Amino acid sequence: MADLPTPLTNLKIQYTKIFINNEWHDSVSGKKFPVLNPATEEQICLIEEGDKADVDKAVKAARQAFQIGSPWRTMDASERGRLLYKLADLIERDRLLLATMESLNAGKLFPNAYLMDLGGCIKTLRYCAGWADKIQGRTMPMDGDFFCYTRHEPVGVCGQIIPWNFPLVMLIWKIGPALSCGNTVIVKPAEQTPLTALHVASLIKEAGFPPGVVNIVPGYGPTAGAAISSHMDIDKVAFTGSTEVGKLIKEAAGKSNLKRVTLELGGKSPCIVFADADLDNAVEFAHQGVFYHQGQCCIAASRLFVEESIYDEFVRRSVERAKKYVLGNPLAPEVNQGPQIDKEQYNKILDLIESGKKEGAKLECGGGPWGNKGYFIQPTVFSNVTDEMRIAKEEIFGPVQQIMKFKSLDDVIKRANNTTYGLSAGIFTKDLDKAVTVSSALQAGTVWVNCYSVVSAQVPFGGFKMSGNGRELGEYGLQQYTEVKTVTVKISQKNS
């Protein structure tokens, strides 16, 4: 933490308009919407509210930028990579400003925003930049006198809908691979957290991306988001958010032009701690797995299964750890838990906490709101949780840990998989055979062994079942932004 700077004070929000064709636009409707600080419930600024008419403008710009012969389509792939490297450099230059803005707007702890979010964004962009001139097809020795090869071509115009829990990280996860592969994009940031995306829009222009390649339309899901999902001239939509909204997006994509869809959705991830695990390590990773960013993570370790013989000690240590939190302004250095994102999420979490109490779980600590302003909830730990309770089945998205007990390996695998979700899972054991056996059996897109929430640009991320379709990051994530074209050429004579 020695390299951590002090957050900016008196931050001025410079960019509040819609970004289309490298220019700033007022909304067609003339409407604006407020952006709040969740720690104080006070208004930060007003943002231009995009809707269908603004999405139409953005799609027109993106389609024009994607036309055959355009500067973007004729640009060398290595030059696309250079632009992405330049964007990463500019984000690094503005790292302190963006981290302060993310903390103010999204309630993120400033150290996490600066070190983890901004650090991850910069690394991911540079990873994607390096791929730009390495996206290759193949030649195939087909039967007959033919020469056959494949091209991996950009999908086209991509709509990208960003969540509020990791606004800047998810923006980069979306635009990095899409631009590396040569697509153009229309981004809709979450209405709660549009500020960092709009600042990055200014950096897109500064980096030298041609007009129309990146367009950012802030607005609400039922209007701007729905317009993207159902648009007849958008070729692909990528969404990170709730499973409920993901279903609507996939339905709209199917009913419109059958556009390609990538979804990274909800989770109720199991974390299994065997009796032979390093207990200190397991307690800390399981704790961070559910309390990081106030529990507002799709991969949260929200179903914690602990082997019976170590259960009581694990609960004791987990409660002791949760009680160490200092709540308050996420920009303050002594604070290590900030607010939930908004009133709706705050009320939902408190309702689920009350359901845990009513259904018979043992409240070990926390269990209610904190403070007299802002959307703060006490770090909460439940023990004696059973599988049929709401807190064991529903995605809470808050600082609530529920600890369940198990007796056998077969039993815990069955219980861990007994969910509609399949985003991630964790296993803690010193037994390699057990780790391999259980990781193979769990229905999850990512399984961590003796760690949790370890995510990197090089590694694919995505879910099984109702946690989504497709993958982000890594080479697998790049594949989601290309179409494979087969080209077969008749030749006079084939030679091997």
UniProtKB/Swiss-Prot annotation:
Binding site residues for NAD(+): 162-165, 188-191, 221-222, 241-242, 264-266, 344-348, 395-397
Q: Which GO terms describe its cellular component?
A: axon; cytosol; synapse
Which residues are recorded as modified (Phosphoserine)? Answer: 408
Q: Which SUPFAM superfamilies match?
A: ALDH-like
Q: What is catalyzed by this enzyme?
A: an aldehyde + NAD(+) + H2O = a carboxylate + NADH + 2 H(+); all-trans-retinal + NAD(+) + H2O = all-trans-retinoate + NADH + 2 H(+); 9-cis-retinal + NAD(+) + H2O = 9-cis-retinoate + NADH + 2 H(+); 11-cis-retinal + NAD(+) + H2O = 11-cis-retinoate + NADH + 2 H(+)
Keyword Acetylation among UniProt keywords = yes
InterPro entries found in the cross-reference section: Ald_DH/histidinol_DH, Ald_DH_C, Ald_DH_CS_CYS, Ald_DH_CS_GLU, Ald_DH_N, Aldehyde_DH_dom
E.C. number(s) listed in UniProt: 1.2.1.19, 1.2.1.28, 1.2.1.3, 1.2.1.36
Tagged with keyword Membrane: no
Query: Which subcellular locations apply to this protein?
Result: Cytoplasm, Cytosol; Cell projection, Axon
| Major subcellular location class | cytoplasm
What does its PTM field state?
Answer: The N-terminus is blocked most probably by acetylation.
Region (Mediates interaction with PRMT3): which ranges?
331-496
GO terms for MF: 3-deoxyglucosone dehydrogenase activity; acetaldehyde dehydrogenase (NAD+) activity; aldehyde dehydrogenase (NAD+) activity; aminobutyraldehyde dehydrogenase (NAD+) activity; benzaldehyde dehydrogenase (NAD+) activity; retinal dehydrogenase activity
Oligomeric and partner information:
Homotetramer. Interacts with PRMT3; the interaction is direct, inhibits ALDH1A1 aldehyde dehydrogenase activity and is independent of the methyltransferase activity of PRMT3.
Recorded protein name is Aldehyde dehydrogenase 1A1
